A protein has these predicted regions:
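Alpha-helical adaptor scaffolds
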Residues: 46-110
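Alpha-helical segment of the N-proximal tetratricopeptide repeat
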Residues: 8-36, 40, 50-57
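TPR/TPR-like (Sel1-like) alpha-helical repeat modules
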Residues: 73, 127-150, 164
Length: 179
């Protein structure tokens, strides 16, 4: 095992330990834990992300935002990058930065097309931006893609057709909207 692999294994174990200790009702100890972990692994994008996630869970979105931006700029990869993009997009939405949130979540949707959670959070951001047609279209498409039952399968073409229609309405509204 290489030194980099050993370091990653140690970091992964430490992150798992932090999650095992986490109390969502009292995030201060978790923030302290992940901040200390970041001191051990300075500039490691995964450690940076975990500090951001702890602040986010505590409701301090503004502080979380900076950590998410640093983690992404530091080269976060794989599923951790997907989770970071999702949480960053959600944080931007909570901060009222709807267009930025949609941009980040569309990037995540493009890079991780099989992530249902990204699609749901994109729909939330579209809704928050008063783009309900696009939000419902995303959820209808998700239902058609992921819910397989005789009842849904029977109406899949209608769900997809309605999703396409709603996207058309949203696109028309976006073209008419003042820039």
């Amino acid at each position: 095992m290489s030194s980099a692999d050993e370091t990653q294994a140690e970091l992964d174990a430490a992150i798992s330990e932090g999650y095992a200790r986490r109390d969502r009702d009292n995030m201060a100890p978790t923030i302290e834990y992940f901040t200390a972990l970041l001191a051990q692994y300075p500039d490691h994008p995964q450690a940076i992300y975990e500090v951001g996630g702890a602040y986010d869970t505590a409701g301090d979105e503004q502080r979380a935002r900076g950590f998410y931006e640093r983690a992404l700029a530091g080269g976060l990869q794989g599923d951790t990058r997907r989770r970071c993009l999702l949480q960053y997009g959600s944080t931007l939405r909570n901060l009222g930065l709807f267009d930025e949130s949609i941009t980040v979540l569309r990037e995540a949707r493009s890079d991780y097309p099989d992530s249902d959670s990204v699609r749901v959070f994109l729909a939330l951001s579209l809704h928050a931006a008063s783009r309900s047609d696009a939000a419902v279209a995303e959820l209808l498409s998700l239902a058609a893609d992921r819910i397989h039952s005789p009842d849904i399968d029977r109406y899949e073409p209608a769900l997809r057709g309605n999703a396409d229609y709603l996207r058309t309405l949203d696109a028309s509204a976006q073209e008419r909207a003042p820039q």
